[in-house]
Amino acid sequence: MRALWTSSVYKVTYARSKPRLALLTKSFSSTPYYKLTTTELFQSNKSSLGKIKINPDRLWDTIHSTAKWTEPKKVSNDDINTAGLTRLTLSNEDKLARDWFVETTKSLGCQVHVDQIGNIFAIRPGLRGENEDMSATFAGSHLDSQPSGGRFDGVLGIAAGIEMLRTLNDNWIETEGPVGVVNWTNEEGARYPISMMGSGVWSGRISLDDAWSTKSVSPGRPVTMVKQELERIGYLGASPASYNKGVRIGAHFELHIEQGPKLEKSGQKVGVVEGVQAYKWFTVTVTGREAHAGTTDMANRFDAMHTAAEFMVEARAITGAQPGGGGGGLVTFGRLTASPGSVNTIAGKVEMSLDMRSPSDQGLAKMVGKLYDLVDRLNNAATKNGKPLHSGLGVEIREDFSSAAVKFSTEAIRCVEESAAAVLGDGHGHGEKTMQRMTSGAGHDSVCTNMHCPTAMIFVPSKDGVSHNPSEWTDKEDCATGANVLLQSVLRMDKLRKDRGDFE
């Protein structure tokens, strides 16, 4: 350790010069402060790393203060500490949250870059950070939400990343390489129906032009396109939205609420996420014939709504789901519109969204095969006398989005597991019983970063397993635990990358 002063606390800012200097601004305190590199932190006594902890109150305040940027009529109540939020991507509310992110990270000594899809990268230089092309170790997540969603989904990861930066500054820790926080654009896919859009463009799985031209699907709102809204709110950046031409990422860690019940039911505090299950999104269109509800007998109806209902029931059966149990797959119909939408008119057209998921690519492929069999069966079904049951009706299905099953990096998982054991343990790292390895049921931006850099995720419990809902909740202590695991994971990866020569 290199002692700086024993009678003062200093605020650190960074100068880009060779050799690199720390510029110090003095305030008074009796607390001794030291300046440590990540390597020195690991080389000191074993408890030193464990003493570097985030500020739980500050993290909690950050989470709840960001909830003020919401459409106020979309929350279930007015309590700022419990209400959910609606912060659709590229909305006015999203702009306010983005502005806060930029201003806050700049105040913490970060360089901020915005790319062509609106991803925001805040980078804190490291000891060996003079090369601007050097890839940083990032904590990442998203600030956008679902309509009437929760205040922890995505926000926890961003707030914990900022708390990581604050804690590094508070404790005078100088990382070997640069570290940072990234806010990914349109993770949710609620307003523009391509989830993980920003990270998808960055990774190359989605083309920039396709993303820019995606149209909004928010009911009751004007139709807009992504590029148009990026320009409107001032976040159409100049940096290439590309893993190899834009901001480079050396490793990516994402803290997130579980959004399911497993951790809470088991009494465990941390989920070490090994990967993410496969999923596909479809648009299903059923066409029939509009007719009067009072004058058309049941035998002569081409009722699109009835066929849509039959499709939904049979599609659910594809998963193998049983009452009170499951078959490994998941099917969800989240949006449905019927035309013409009159109470006394038989529906002539129904359009609905379909989300299908499975832990494996093979399992999902089998489900999709059965789905197309179902479409064929409904289009060609016959009654006992051979007359087509659905004459005048048709079912069409279009695949809109696909995400293969993902296995995260072994070395990144190890960083999380070792960090969780240390944070949850008894001072000697024995915290294994309070964590579990698990697979994420939901897609996350880490799916995309995993294509190009070591990636892992950290889960913390969700009350009653509820998410995408105003009642979404994670306790303060669990948020702090996850943030401490995130901090340690980034520091462990920073040392690992230094030891293998990433920063030479």
Language model regions located:
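His/Asp/Glu-rich mid-to-C-terminal helical/loop segments that flank catalytic regions of hydrolases
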Residues: 37, 102-103, 292, 296-322, ...
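Acidic/His- and Gly-rich active-site-bordering loop/insert found
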Residues: 42-46, 53-149, 168
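Zn-dependent metallopeptidase/amidohydrolase metal-coordination segment
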Residues: 51-78, 137-141, 256, 429-484, ...
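Active-site-adjacent substrate-binding region
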Residues: 72, 222-274, 312-316, 320, ...
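A short beta-alpha structural unit
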Residues: 84-89, 332-341, 353-359, 388-413, ...
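Active-site metal-coordination/substrate-binding segment of hydrolases
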Residues: 102-107, 111, 115, 121-214, ...
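Alpha-helical metal-binding/catalytic segments enriched in His/Glu/Asp
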Residues: 139, 148-188, 280-286, 296-318, ...
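Midchain, well-structured core segments that form catalytic/ion-binding scaffolds
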Residues: 186-187, 193-362
